Regions:
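Local sequence-structure signature of Cys/Sec-based thiol-disulfide redox active-site neighborhoods
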Residues: 1-30
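Short alpha-helical
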Residues: 15, 41, 72
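Non-catalytic, surface beta->alpha helical segment in thiol-disulfide oxidoreductase systems
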Residues: 61-84
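Thiol-based oxidoreductase modules, predominantly thioredoxin-like and allied folds used
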Residues: 31-42
């Protein structure tokens, strides 16, 4: 089974988002970053998917992780068997 596509909804100056991007990049994960601060349509998409108005939000296929730190991110990836 292929790994789910990872999409990170973030904002440019969000420290939690920067940490998540660094964490994923340093471990070799492939992911798409969507800046909801610059793209209103993407913000509405994130809000519709997650019922959240704050970032970060990580979408991995049908699974979502919201308002997280890197420890929670690592746990989420492991629990769902998502590898780089």
């Amino acid at each position: 089974m292929a790994a789910p596509e990872l999409t990170l909804y973030s904002r440019e100056m969000c420290s939690w988002c920067i940490d998540a991007k660094d964490f994923l990049s340093e471990r070799g994960y492939r992911f798409t970053v969507v800046d909801v601060g610059r793209n209103r349509e993407a913000y509405e998409e994130m809000k519709s998917l997650s019922s959240q108005t704050s970032v970060p939000v990580l979408a991995a296929g049908d699974e979502l992780l919201v308002n997280f730190d890197t420890d929670q991110l690592e746990k989420f990836l492991n629990e769902h068997g998502i590898k780089p």
